[in-house]
Amino acid sequence: MGSPFKDHHTLHPSLVRKLIPWTFYAMVPLVLFRVYLYPYPLHHTTTTILTSSPVSPPPALLEDETSCDYTDGNWVPDRRDPLYNGSTCGTIKEGQSCIAHGRPDMGYLYWRWKPKQCKLPRFEPNTFLQLLRNKHLAFVGDSMARNQLESLLCMLSSVSPPNLVYRDGEENKFRRWYFESHNFSISVYWSPFLVRGVEKSNTGLNHNQLFLDHVDERWAADMNGIDMVVLSIGHWFLHPAVYYEGDQVLGCHYCPDLNHTEIGFYDILRKAIKTTLKALVDRKGPNDNGFDALVTTFSPAHFEGDWDKLGACPKTEPCKEGEKTLEGMDAEMRQVEVEEVEAAKMNSVQLEKFRLEALDVSKLSLMRPDGHPGPYMHPFPFAYGVAERVQNDCVHWCLPGPIDTWNEILLEVIKKWEYASRREQ
């Protein structure tokens, strides 16, 4: 299936000639308006920034844009092309570059999330960079955190190319980019539990170990140099694991060969988030410069069959309203995360410059079974016919794809915070 607007790219030549003069005169006031509101250049500057850049006013913010229930809405057709593609963005993980890997249908690119009560604007890369000028944003968590980070990097790269300034570890699990144009850094930290953990391996443990009363210092040790953090975990809690608290075994999840009590993973996820948010409040809450934190809620998978069979996630369009309901494990994981964010907000209410929100993307993600790589996690999987086993990724998201909407909402949360800060001044 192609774009639902497959013919919208074609214009008759005579119509084009008529439109050009009109377009020119129509653009003049728009250009002047943009220069007035957006003083920063659209393209990457070569000026070397050795110290913090002076903070200039961010774009004008409208009060009616700062309050919205983004969870209540629908996916509607959208004529506009994505801000980037596999050839214009070099940070897309190979397994999420669906078009470059031969995915034939393009329709999944032409939808936008429309909240029922308000407007969700298209992502504005310049606005994001202006609001985060002189700051360091970190994405911390599992591969969904990395997926969201790479989406954001690609959209920002459409106006200002970043420089990769740090890399450590296998599979690009720890990286940092620098936007010289705005003295702005973005990092990604691999920490699938947020708390201290030992991951299972092919040569060692056949289960994970989690130490629930200790935050993972692999990322937390850098907290003093971070201004905003986006936390994203969940899927790794489904794996077999043994849990420790106070140096004692608390229990386990799916450990039939061990003499431990089976306690599942919902309460463990809650403890991990609670420990993490408490560490943020304790270490960054008293900071006079302020600190912002967001928790991206659980993103449902869309397996409709065996992961290694053709058709594991075959959909090519979003779900319609009422077609799917957030329930079971997906709903429980989201609820735990939202509840712990609200509890941490109550515990930090006296900290004026500590801001915390849940980036609630569970429902809108549930409604996009068409947005996963599926078999196109590998290049041209059917070039030699359909094999007996076809590996599918029905968890992560194609880039570009529905996950770009997460960062549109992220920007709106930041704009809401900025508006509140201005109003208080």
Curated annotation (Swiss-Prot):
Cytoplasmic side: 1-18
Lumenal-side positions: 39-425
Cysteines paired by S-S bonds: 68-118, 89-154, 98-398, 313-394
GO biological process: xylan acetylation
Principal location listed in the UniProt entry: Golgi
Glycosylation sites: 85, 183, 259
Swiss-Prot/TrEMBL keywords: Disulfide bond, Glycoprotein, Golgi apparatus, Membrane, Signal-anchor, Transferase, Transmembrane, Transmembrane helix
Protein's membrane topology: Single-pass type II membrane protein
Active site: 143, 393, 396
Motif (GDS motif) on chain: 141-143
The UniProt record lists the keyword Membrane: yes
GO CC terms of this entry: Golgi apparatus; Golgi membrane
Transmembrane segments: 19-38
Motif (DXXH motif): 393-396
Subcellular location: Golgi apparatus membrane
Pfam hit, one: PMR5N
GO molecular function list: O-acetyltransferase activity; xylan O-acetyltransferase activity
InterPro entries, per the entry: TBL, TBL_C, TBL_N
Documented EC number(s): 2.3.1.-
Family: Belongs to the PC-esterase family. TBL subfamily.
Function: Xyloglucan acetyltransferase that catalyzes the acetylation of fucosylated Gal residues on xyloglucan side chains. Predominantly catalyze 6-O-monoacetylation of Gal residues in the Fuc-Gal-Xyl trisaccharide side chains of xyloglucan oligomers.
Protein name: Xyloglucan O-acetyltransferase 2
Species annotation: Populus trichocarpa
Highest classification ranks of the organism: Eukaryota, Viridiplantae, Streptophyta, Embryophyta, Tracheophyta
Gene name as annotated: XGOAT2
